Each structure stands twice: as structure tokens, then as C-alpha cells.
Amino acid sequence: DALERLAVNDPSFEFEPETSDALGFGFRCGFLGLLHMEIIQQRLENEADIDLVQTAPNVTYEIVNKRGETISIHKPQDVPDPGDVEEFRQPIVRCNVIVPTDFIGAVMKLCQERRGIQQSQEYLGAQRAMITYDIPLAEVVYDLHDKIKSCTRGYGTLDYEMVGYEPADLCRLDIMVNGKRVDAL
């Protein structure tokens, strides 16, 4: 009920019910970023007096199975047996980072550590540059914006847009407890 009220007032907030063996019943929520997530969390705690358990953000991957069908994977438990998987695909975003020229090297290093592939570099004047990288969304959603702000002393900006899905070198890892496959914590 509290989530529905928030969704009515904030069309950018999405949620759907989900059940986990490890955590029980809950909701998978979609936000515009970490700040948006923190605001929603505070509103739920303050207005609805709800204690929340928050898990790390994740992204939707695609799998092409042996029959050539493309399947969206929202959680690790949905990954089919390895024998049924032809190819894993990860979401890629194009990141435009505007930085003071003094911090170009630090930002490039950070983007490369996040598996980014540089697309362009353009000087916007004597003091600023825009660096464009294609980076896996999983490397962006958690803290890339904060890291860019940190390594540019608050002067860097980041915006990104979805490019599509690209092949990824991934595999399924099962966690077994007492011989039974369980959800990852």
C-alpha cells in the first residue's frame, strides 16, 4: 500500500513483488539512481514506519539459448543450465563525463577500471573536456557517479544512456547449502 502511494506520486519509481529463499517476500524496485533510492527509502521509513532490508543494485542480463531465443534474466536464479546457454549478454551504457582538464587522467583510469571502452574525447574549452566511454551497466549503477565526483573534487558530471546488449564472458555460479541450491545473499 505504501509503495503504491509512492508510485502514484512518483512515476519514475517502479516496483514488483519478489520472493527469495534467503530473504522471504519483498519487492524489486527501480530507481533513477542512488539518491532517488535513498529518498524513497527515507519516505517509506518515515511515512509508513517500515523497516527495510536493502540489497545491492543489479541489472537485467540477456541470454541466448541453444534454440536461438533471447531471454531476459532479472536474477541469478533465472539463469538456465550451462548446457542450454549459447551466449550471455550484458547491458552497455554510453557514459559522457564532463571534467576539468586537470582530472582527465584520473577519470580515464577509473572508467578503464570499470571495463570501459573509450569512444571519444572532446575539449569544451581550455578548462573542460568531455570523455565518452561505453561501460557495462553493472559497473555504473552502484557508485560510478560518486567515484567520479570524488576523483574530480566534485567538479565532474556524468550522464549515460543505454546503448544495447553486448556479448559477455560470464558463467553461472551455484551456491549450495547442504546440497541444495540457494539464492545468493
Which residues does each predicted region cover?
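Structural and coupling elements of P-loop NTPases
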Residues: 1-185
